[in-house]
């Protein structure tokens, strides 16, 4: 008897969705909007922590999370990404995660992202989390590559953008380097209302003061402040 593979896949998908809803209810999470996840390997999203004492989801969408994921997008890594966490029992905020065609989200450490945040990983772009904590109103937009290291602590209302999104014409010339990768190394503290722009490399142990606009590299162990941000102290540490 010939087996219709399409029917089997449809049945398997429905079973996984049903199981996922039960899991989310058990751990206190309500329904999130999940679109077009059918062709993504569910083992990348559910129970990849097999064998650990407590099996975890790779992506944990708390109440109010909206995930829009293209079927060709890839999610991998050994960590756990929690979206739209809240300081209070009732959470009035929403958080949006968008993974476009061939986008790559790599989760290598445990990451908590709080409410009212937006994360876009655009076509063929890569976002890497290695662990940390990011407060409300985080805005990450990736057109090339953004890498965020371990123990990175981000305050409220921070924007990280690796692209200008538009070309700039002046003196008969046209800008060509619209996008450039951003690297934030380990143990970095980013203050509230900070903007980090394309091509920036922030070294290990650096601190970015509140309100700074970072357009150039910040060396390891330095404090940068201002618009545009400049190094104002060296050989610092923080806890």
What are these regions (language model features)?
Residues 89-94, 166-174:
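Short, flexible, glycine-rich and Lys/Arg-enriched loop motifs at helix boundaries
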Residues 2-161, 185-186, 204, 220, ...:
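Domain-scale signature associated with acetyltransferase and cell-envelope carbohydrate enzymes
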Residues 139-143, 193-206, 212-215:
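Beta-rich strand-turn-strand
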Residues 164, 171-172, 200, 235:
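Conserved catalytic-core motifs of eukaryotic protein kinase domains, centered on the activation segment
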Residues 173-184:
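Glycine-rich NAD(P)-binding loop of Rossmann-like domains
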């Amino acid at each position: 008897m010939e087996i219709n593979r399409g029917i089997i896949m449809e049945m398997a998908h429905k079973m996984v969705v049903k199981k996922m809803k039960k899991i989310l209810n058990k751990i206190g999470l309500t329904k999130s909007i999940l679109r077009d996840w059918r062709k993504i390997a569910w083992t990348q999203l559910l129970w990849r922590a097999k064998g650990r004492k407590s099996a975890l989801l790779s992506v944990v969408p708390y109440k109010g999370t909206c995930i829009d994921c293209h079927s060709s997008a890839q999610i991998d890594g050994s960590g756990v990404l929690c979206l739209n966490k809240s300081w209070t029992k009732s959470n009035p905020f929403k958080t949006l995660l968008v993974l476009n065609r061939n986008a790559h989200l790599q989760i290598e450490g445990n990451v908590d992202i709080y409410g009212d945040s937006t994360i876009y990983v655009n076509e063929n772009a890569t976002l890497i989390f290695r662990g940390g904590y990011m407060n409300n109103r985080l805005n990450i937009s990736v057109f090339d590559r953004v890498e965020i290291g371990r123990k990175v602590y981000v305050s409220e209302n921070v924007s990280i953008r690796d692209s200008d999104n538009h070309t700039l014409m002046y003196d008969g010339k046209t800008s060509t380097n619209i996008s450039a990768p951003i690297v934030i190394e380990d143990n970095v503290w980013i203050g509230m209302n900070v903007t980090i722009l394309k091509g920036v490399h922030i070294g290990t142990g650096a601190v970015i003061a509140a309100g700074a606009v970072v357009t150039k590299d910040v060396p390891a162990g330095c404090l940068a402040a201002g618009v545009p941000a400049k190094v104002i102290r060296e050989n610092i540490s923080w806890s």
